[in-house]
């Protein structure tokens, strides 16, 4: 079959783009990739059609060549097509380079055994360096664009295999001084420098002269697949964000370069920074992030290299660069920014946020930067929200919120105002223009707009968003809280239809505000006349706030309202309030009301519910009523106890405490998976047990809450039923589990019983590291061993052997965790301790009665546990 024409390809590509999966599943789908590669070499197709084909291959490379062999063949064909292009200028050269790179990356074919990879890498390096271009790669005017494209392709390969181009650092460093595109070369050099520093710091090696240019014309390879394989993807953030101090300590190694390497490194970074002004703002931000991240992990290297750039960047109008400055400040603090720099930057942000012509997104950016401003010396604890110390009254006066602002901008400014009020500890009552006065004025204005009858729902939503923000920031500010509660009460009085908003607010606010707000709303709801049009909203509010309240006024309101409840919706709302009162025990007044409702309500469903509630109130105590009508997460099975009236109604609702009908024990443990699993065995003793639910509670706060385990049925005489309980330790320590069983009997009764507590031993938390490739065990263990210090601790313990030898002890207790064994003399053992610790053991040559054990761990708190465990092995 010959090559397709332009119209045929246009129809084929249109059908593919309409539904790629459906097209590939059809008859023409199998040949699409092969035909595309073949027709790229056809002279009958125009260059514009070939551009369309290559564009499709860039967008859908993973669908056209989904596996490594297909991607390898496609990349080889694309490179052959590139070589066969005529010498005249062509738009295909850049697209062919991009398509070959994309095919290798998306098909996961990039590697040392890939022939296309070994062809593409030297070609891209030659193009990026400006040499080996030759006449076959276009005219000199085209080669500048090819050089930029080659740098982009190399950058993509480096991102997929970090450390791959570490050997080309010296060559790449020499490129910015030559004639050629500055931006792609600078970004590529910064990326390779960043990745090389991280990879070398992981391995503990220095830069080893990598920054010095070498001559690769002799055929030596400047790329290193070994470094790329050693990269650990979780160490590299996926976006330009700075880690917290804790994240840095856990995941970012520190490199201490030699004096020669430090000198070359400073020169390379200074070279990139000196030409950074020639880059676009987005490219400059990426460059600063890469260099800042890399230098942050260098011991003894102060960030003074960035100082000359601050003169230019502190006055920039580009938001991306301003964000980069704040990122540098968050990373280096007072090591790079003086107090004058900090004051200037904060004033710059404050004045920028006051510009009247700013669009809302830009306005929000400035406000967010002020709210999250990284101070040199913050006074409060880490993670606590606070206004910047240098943000004085004069600076923030222009940042006060106004009702004329966009809602998102108003909330952001209100957030800042709340932080200023939190810092204003004096709270002078005669202060008429202070932060608290501004806050009360804004809240009053928002409440007045929300109270307009028939006003837009958006105004009410904004008012409640602002109220929640104030309660969240000023929990302990009694004056503001009192003002807010009084204003919300007036708002409900004016517009009861906002009851759903009030219910949602009560669910979200802190307990300090919830209780006084609940009392005020209860008073407002019961004070309204029962025949008003807002009756349904008052009933909805009472269903939320009536529980635990004084019932006399509430019952009086309900008795008056019952006469006006004429439809099914009002009946249900009225019964929901009765249900809320039932949960706190009810009383004679409630019983009389329920009897009246059971006789007077017009629909049968309402009468049945009222009769049911009356029976519950008559037969159950207050505590049982609370369990029966208010099922919680702690007792989910009790909701099923509600059933129709019958002779055994009262008995069926009672959960009886009995002796344990089952036997629960700890079985043999299996060390595998991401989290420890406690293997349990359960057996029924004398009678069948149905719908069994086992609930576990951990003493203390050592573990995350444990999920309940459900078993449909257990019968006596059956083999032990295995259960697997997933443990999520907050620290690697043994624990004691209290167990309760909730179950149903053959007679249909619900019972509960307490079981003997279970012990989680220290060894039950042990987890192995993933299986390693053969031959890499010793290097892996040495890397873990070296990474424990200086943050961790090292110790030596004597492990008695008893009657068994060293090999038997290791085989019985430590076999899953052995990284490398050289019996009978040496065992290297690596154990993961959740959530994020490890324990490393070196068992040396056994003596007559024991074996010396050298151990390291990154968690000093486990040392006593390790000693007790090793000394107790011989006694098992």
UniProtKB/Swiss-Prot annotation:
Cystine crosslinks: none
Record keywords: Protein transport, Transport
Superkingdom as given in the UniProt entry: Eukaryota
CC per GO annotation: AP-5 adaptor complex; AP-type membrane coat adaptor complex; late endosome
InterPro entries xref list: AP5B1, AP5B1_barrel, AP5B1_C, AP5B1_middle, AP5B1_N
GO biological process, one term: endosomal transport
Subunit architecture: Probably part of the adaptor protein complex 5 (AP-5), a tetramer composed of AP5B1, AP5M1, AP5S1 and AP5Z1. Interacts with ZFYVE26 and SPG11.
Function text: As part of AP-5, a probable fifth adaptor protein complex it may be involved in endosomal transport.
Protein name: AP-5 complex subunit beta-1
Lineage: Eukaryota, Metazoa, Chordata, Craniata, Vertebrata
Gene name for this UniProt entry: Ap5b1
């Amino acid at each position: 079959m010959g090559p397709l024409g332009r119209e045929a390809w246009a129809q084929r590509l249109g059908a593919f783009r309409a539904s790629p999966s459906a097209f590939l599943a059809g008859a023409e789908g199998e040949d699409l990739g092969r035909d595309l590669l073949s027709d790229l070499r056809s002279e009958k197709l125009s260059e514009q059609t070939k551009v369309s084909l290559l564009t499709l291959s860039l967008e859908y490379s993973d669908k056209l060549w989904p596996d490594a062999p297909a991607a390898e063949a496609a990349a080889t064909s694309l490179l052959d097509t590139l070589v066969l292009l005529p010498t005249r200028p062509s738009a295909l050269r850049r697209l062919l380079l991009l398509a070959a790179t994309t095919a290798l990356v998306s098909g996961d074919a990039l590697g040392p055994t890939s022939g296309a990879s070994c062809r593409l890498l030297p070609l891209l390096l030659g193009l990026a360096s400006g040499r080996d271009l030759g006449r076959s790669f276009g005219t000199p005017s085209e080669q500048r664009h090819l050089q930029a494209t080659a740098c982009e392709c190399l950058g993509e390969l480096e991102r997929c295999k970090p450390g791959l181009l570490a050997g080309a650092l010296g060559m790449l460093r020499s490129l910015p001084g030559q004639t050629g595109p500055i931006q792609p070369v600078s970004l590529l050099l910064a990326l390779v420098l960043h990745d090389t520093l991280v990879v070398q710091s992981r391995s503990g090696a220095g830069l080893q002269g990598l920054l010095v240019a070498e001559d690769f014309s002799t055929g030596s390879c400047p790329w290193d697949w070994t470094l790329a394989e050693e990269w650990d993807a979780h160490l590299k953030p996926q976006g330009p964000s700075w880690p917290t101090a804790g994240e840095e300590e856990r995941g970012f190694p520190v490199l201490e370069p030699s004096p020669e390497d430090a000198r070359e490194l400073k020169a390379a970074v200074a070279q990139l920074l000196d030409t950074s002004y020639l880059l676009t703002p987005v490219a400059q931000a990426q460059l600063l992030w890469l260099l800042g991240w890399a230098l942050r992990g260098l011991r003894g290297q102060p960030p003074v290299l960035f100082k000359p750039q601050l003169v230019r960047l502190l006055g920039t109008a580009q938001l991306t660069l301003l964000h980069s400055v704040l990122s540098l400040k968050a990373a280096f603090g007072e090591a790079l920014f003086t107090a004058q720099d900090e004051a200037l930057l904060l004033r710059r942000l404050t004045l920028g946020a006051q510009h009247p012509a700013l669009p809302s997104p830009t306005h929000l950016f400035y406000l967010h930067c002020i709210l999250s401003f990284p101070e040199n010396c913050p006074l409060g604890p880490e993670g606590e929200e606070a206004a910047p110390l240098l943000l004085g009254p004069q600076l923030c006066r222009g940042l006060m919120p106004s009702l004329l602002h966009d809602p998102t901008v108003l909330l952001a400014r209100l957030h800042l105002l709340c932080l200023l009020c939190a810092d204003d500890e004096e709270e002078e009552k005669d202060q008429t223009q202070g932060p608290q006065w501004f806050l009360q004025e804004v809240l009053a204005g928002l409440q007045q707009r929300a109270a307009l009858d028939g006003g837009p729902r958006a105004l009410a939503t904004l008012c409640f968003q602002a109220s929640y923000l104030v309660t969240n920031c000023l929990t302990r500010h009694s004056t503001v809280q009192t003002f807010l509660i009084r204003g919300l009460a007036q708002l409900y009085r004016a517009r009861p239809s906002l009851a759903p908003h009030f219910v949602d607010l009560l669910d979200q606010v802190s307990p300090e505000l919830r209780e006084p707000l609940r009392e005020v709303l209860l008073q407002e709801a019961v004070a309204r006349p029962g025949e008003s049009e807002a009756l349904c909203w008052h009933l909805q509010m009472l269903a939320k706030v009536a529980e635990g309240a004084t019932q006399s006024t509430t019952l009086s309101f309900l008795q008056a309202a019952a006469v006006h409840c004429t439809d099914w919706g009002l009946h249900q709302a009225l019964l929901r309030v009765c249900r809320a009162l039932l949960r706190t025990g009810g009383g004679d007044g409630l019983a009389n009301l329920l009897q009246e409702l059971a006789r007077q309500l017009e629909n049968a469903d309402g009468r049945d519910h009222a009769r049911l509630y009356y029976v519950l109130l008559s037969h159950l105590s207050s505590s049982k009523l609370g369990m029966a009508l208010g099922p919680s997460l702690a007792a989910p099975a009790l909701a099923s106890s509600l059933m129709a009236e019958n002779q055994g109604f009262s008995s069926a609702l009672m959960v009886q405490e009995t002796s344990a009908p089952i036997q629960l024990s700890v079985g043999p443990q299996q060390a595998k998976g991401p989290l420890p699993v406690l293997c349990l065995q359960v057996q029924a003793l004398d009678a069948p047990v149905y719908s069994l639910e086992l609930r576990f509670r951990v003493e203390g706060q050592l573990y995350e809450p444990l999920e309940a385990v459900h078993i449909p049925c257990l019968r006596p005489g059956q083999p032990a039923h295995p259960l697997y309980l997933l443990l999520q330790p907050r620290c690697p320590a043994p624990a004691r589990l209290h167990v309760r069983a909730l179950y149903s009997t053959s007679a249909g009764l619900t019972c509960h019983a307490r079981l003997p507590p279970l012990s989680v031993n220290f060894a039950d938390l042990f987890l192995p590291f993933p299986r390693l490739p053969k031959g890499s065990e010793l290097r892996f263990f040495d890397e873990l061993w070296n990474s424990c210090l200086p943050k961790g601790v090292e110790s030596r313990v004597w492990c008695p052997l008893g009657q068994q030898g060293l090999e038997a002890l290791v085989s019985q207790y430590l076999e899953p965790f052995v990284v490398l064994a050289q019996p009978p003399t040496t065992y290297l053992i690596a154990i993961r301790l959740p959530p994020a610790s490890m324990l490393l053991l070196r068992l040396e040559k056994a003596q007559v009665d024991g074996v010396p054990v050298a151990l390291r761990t990154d968690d000093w708190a486990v040392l006593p546990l390790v000693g007790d465990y090793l000394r107790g092995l011989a006694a098992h």
